[in-house]
Amino acid sequence: VKTSQTGYIQRRLVKGLEDLKVEYDMTVRNNKNKIIQYSYGDDGIDPIRVESQILPLVNMSVEEIYTHYQMPSDNMKDDVFTTSYTKPTLKRLKKQITDTNKRCKEIIDMMIEYRDTIIKYVFKMRDNKKVNIPVAFQQIINNVRGQQYINVNSMVDITPLEALELIDDGYKRIESFHYVKPTELFKIMYYYYLTPKNLLMVKRFNRNAVEILIEK
């Protein structure tokens, strides 16, 4: 039943909605430029809390961080290291050792600095390593591996440096998104899980698999 009171409420709602507009940053604001909705058409659910994941970096020592990232390129005669690569790839790898070590060192230094930062400002010195971000990195990596039928005997046709270049290019594309720029925590997770040592030596990803992974 419509009464004078419900009619008044309806009029206020209509007049209020007339003042709403979607700005260029995709936020919904009123006539006083106050944010009513952070994303136009959003369902109000915080997507950052969709995936609860482990970030082992916070409990890693400097030596463990080096072990996680540094490619064992000092000994090219090590069968464990070389047998996974195709012969043409191995030739390219030998020529790229210096550049590979240089880029790995840059990432290691970055992650050591990030480790100290997130312990202090994200976990606030608490003994915790769970984070909530909308991308399940480990699950995506395993899905791509399964979809491409990669196993422990698969041959790798991409060098660590070439993989790093694809990984860096992938992050730059994500970073170029104007409205949804990645957070520092996303960057840490991205470079923690997407390492050539894990993808190439452990998971045995080939070039096609790495490209598919980056696109996802």
What are these regions (language model features)?
Residues 1-66, 196-216:
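Long insertion/accessory domains within large nucleic-acid-processing enzymes
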